Amino acid sequence: MEKRLVYNSVVCLICGEHLVSRHRHDFQQCSCENGAVCDGGLEYERFGAKDLEAIQSFCVYDDEPHEVIRFYVERGSRGKNMDEELKYIKLKDVDDDHLKVIIKYEEEIRPNNRFLKIYKTEVKYRKKNK
């Protein structure tokens, strides 16, 4: 099976901005003269800059050990009542109850979501590493 992106980012080594592209065509650009860019979300890796030597591309794929993946997989959340500003939470920081709700939702609504397996692996990881 082909490996797939779970995290797509670029760091501009001139200004230090860390750019994260979370979804297809989520074009991000730093604010300095180097104009570092990151695009493609979790569909493809695209990066650039005026000086390519002054950027560092950092991507994580689903063939990495779960101990690594859990630090980079993110889930958007608007809070329990869906009334909060969107924020992204790393899988390692999602509380157990929230993780159970996520898994239940994905199983019922989006059973083919490629992250469902990662969420279930996180439950096993937590049980094993308590």
PLM-predicted stretches and their roles:
Residues 1-8, 40-71, 115:
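Short, intrinsically disordered terminal segments enriched in charged and Pro/Gly residues
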Residues 9, 26-29:
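Residues immediately within or flanking Cys/His clusters that coordinate Zn2+
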Residues 12-15, 30:
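Short cysteine-rich clusters marking metal-coordination/redox-active sites
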Residues 16-19, 34-38:
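Cys/His-rich microdomains that often coordinate metals
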Residues 21-25, 39-43:
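Short Cys/His-rich "knuckle" micro-motifs
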Residues 23-25, 32, 94, 126:
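A short, structured loop/turn motif at beta-sheet edges
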Residues 64-130:
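Short amphipathic alpha-helical interaction elements located at domain edges
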